[in-house]
Amino acid sequence: LIDERISLQTMLVDAAGSKNPEYTEVLNLVDHIKYEGLTPGEEYEITGELYETKQLQEGTAEPVARGTVRFKAPASSGEAAVPFSVRTASLEGKEVTAYETISKSGEEVASHTDSHSKAQTIRVAPKPHLPGTADNAYAIPLLLALAGSVLIGCTHVFTAKIRRPL
């Protein structure tokens, strides 16, 4: 049962309110939902599911996180927030999209499921690469510095031998 009088608008952000979260091993997201058309005083449940966007569009998606919020609608229009926590190891550099459904007495009355919605989608930042001691980026400057030191040392020894009195 979908009630056509109910409309939803959503915005998925990180816990700080950003659409561009920094990398973290566990990403805390909040799906902000604006609703219109609910019956004031009635109990509702919003269920949010977070999916990898590409898999959603290919039809092979399983939720990577779920969140549920129960509330009594104070007015026909209002806002609710569904929190998610998701481990980012398999999602680095990928987009995730939130789908929402609103139920009343166990029956779905509204949903918002659009895998192309930028408001419902957020990109999981890749893990930053920290240079290690064995990185090749440091090898060439180190070799050049070593070669320069050897050259200066040899020049000093050679010059010192030439200046010696006989």
Where are each of the predicted segments found?
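Short, solvent-exposed loop/edge segments of extracellular or virion-exposed proteins
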Residues: Q9-K19, P131-D135
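C-terminal membrane-anchoring or membrane-association module
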Residues: G148-L166
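Juxtamembrane/start-of-transmembrane alpha-helix segments at the extracytoplasmic/lumenal side
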Residues: G132-L146
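Contiguous beta-strand segments within globular domains
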Residues: N20-H32
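Short, surface-exposed loop/turn segments at beta-strand-coil junctions that are enriched for proline
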Residues: E36-L38, P74-S76, S85-G93
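Short proline/glycine- and polar residue-rich coil/turn motifs
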Residues: V69-A80
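Short beta-strand elements
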Residues: L1-R5, E108-K127
